[in-house]
């Protein structure tokens, strides 16, 4: 008997994208909005489908935990501290995107304001 022939088809055509988006978390700009509206996370409704009945939630990481002890251990960990570091940066806005392609009105910088106000006449 001869050897088994190799497959001549695409092995996993796009499956990695399906697996990646199936359990996709929240983006940083969504978490920024959650941090500004943190009052709605003070009293969470009881949900039997979530870990810890949905009562122990880390807003910065958008994760539920089984107990308050698990939440405290998480907040001391590297993953949580790395997320806090990423959240210090302001999210990219639509105005910045439009200014990058010269569609919208960019914010006027200090240098351009000074250039507009300086009407200096040079003596000959």
UniProtKB/Swiss-Prot annotation:
Alphabetized GO MF terms: nucleic acid binding; zinc ion binding
Zinc finger map (C2H2-type): 56-80
SUPFAM superfamilies in the cross-refs: beta-beta-alpha zinc fingers (SSF57667)
Pfam families referenced in this protein's UniProt entry, alphabetically: zf-C2H2_jaz
Superkingdom: Eukaryota
Compartment list: Nucleus, Nucleolus; Cytoplasm
Principal subcellular localization: nucleus
GO biological process per UniProt: ribosome biogenesis
Keywords, ordered alphabetically: Cytoplasm, Metal-binding, Nucleus, Ribosome biogenesis, Zinc, Zinc-finger
InterPro entries linked: C2H2-ZF_Maturation_Protein, Matrin/U1-like-C_Znf_C2H2, Znf_C2H2_jaz, Znf_C2H2_sf, Znf_C2H2_type
Any one of the GO CC terms: cytoplasm
Complex and partners: Associates with pre-60S ribosomal particles.
Family indicated by similarity: Belongs to the ZNF593/BUD20 C2H2-type zinc-finger protein family.
PANTHER family, alphabetized: ZINC FINGER PROTEIN 593
Function field: Involved in pre-60S ribosomal particles maturation by promoting the nuclear export of the 60S ribosome.
Annotated protein name in UniProt: Zinc finger protein bud20
Organism name: Schizosaccharomyces pombe (strain 972 / ATCC 24843)
